[in-house]
Amino acid sequence: MERSVTAGKWLAYCRLMRIDKPIGSLLLLWPTLWALWLAGGGAPAPWTLFVFVAGVFLMRAAGCVINDYADRHFDGHVKRTASRPLPSGEVSEQSAKILFVVLVLLAFGLVLTLNKMTIWLSVAGLVLAWVYPFMKRVSHLPQFVLGAAFGWSIPMAYAAVSESLPATCWMMFLAYICWTVAYDTQYAMVDRDDDLKIGVKSTAILFGRFDNIIIGLLQFSMLALLLALGNITGLGIPYTISLLVAAGMFIYQQILTAGRERDACFKAFHNNKYAGMAIFIGVLFGL
């Protein structure tokens, strides 16, 4: 009995960190890998790669914990999130705060092995990660803050590999923000009806009936920025092909979300992990 209770508690912590749902980690991992390879013109040092991959999973977990803590009084009123560990009472608020601190300290401990520029940038990244969940209370644009928070691994990667932040770094960062706003709007479309009832703000609500048009414009902007970046850095035909593959996936997503059905919007959101992977393959073979 005691063992089963303990096992249940651990499973609740895993669910709080979304270990059972790696989609968010993948959406953060792929652009981090784009940046690591492009910053150095090839594979980064093994330790640098380890720090960033581990950091992605740790900070994504920390982000999920602080997000659920911020939403603890709202999630119980939303069909998709009512069974999460905090609103269901499986994990206490105090335990969630402790877990967040532990995850952040582990990630920061890894960053301390890198150069000073990367360490200072990580502090700004932590602030962005902390601010994002609370933006849903005051602004319809929390997805832009999420894009900056998730995309902050890009300047950190450039700093770690080359100790510089060239224009191409910020082009990639801006492209990633466009992509994040697009895919997280798809995600927000799933909860739009519930969010309207409880007063949570999102780009899905702000964009209204123009949601798919604006998502398409954001996806186009992302691809245009990445194409320009590829031309500047001399990436070859494989990279261009990868962008065409990603464009095909974005068209598929538009077809899925045309009816604005919950399951279809969620499927479109998940499809983005393949777009990110395709672009990374293009970077690998284009260098």
UniProtKB/Swiss-Prot annotation:
CDD domains: PT_UbiA_COQ2. Catalyzes the prenylation of para-hydroxybenzoate (PHB) with an all-trans polyprenyl group. Mediates the second step in the final reaction sequence of ubiquinone-8 (UQ-8) biosynthesis, which is the condensation of the polyisoprenoid side chain with PHB, generating the first membrane-bound Q intermediate 3-octaprenyl-4-hydroxybenzoate. The keyword Plastid does not apply. The chain crosses the membrane at residues 23-40, 98-118, 141-161, 163-183, 213-233, 235-255. Keywords: Cell inner membrane, Cell membrane, Magnesium, Membrane, Transferase, Transmembrane, Transmembrane helix, Ubiquinone biosynthesis. This is 4-hydroxybenzoate octaprenyltransferase. InterPro entries: HB_polyprenyltransferase-like, Prenyltransferase, UbiA_prenyltransferase, UbiA_prenylTrfase_CS, UbiA_sf. It catalyses: all-trans-octaprenyl diphosphate + 4-hydroxybenzoate = 4-hydroxy-3-(all-trans-octaprenyl)benzoate + diphosphate. It comes from Pectobacterium atrosepticum (strain SCRI 1043 / ATCC BAA-672) (Erwinia carotovora subsp. atroseptica). It comes from the Bacteria. One of its GO terms (biological process) is ubiquinone biosynthetic process. Pathway: Cofactor biosynthesis; ubiquinone biosynthesis.
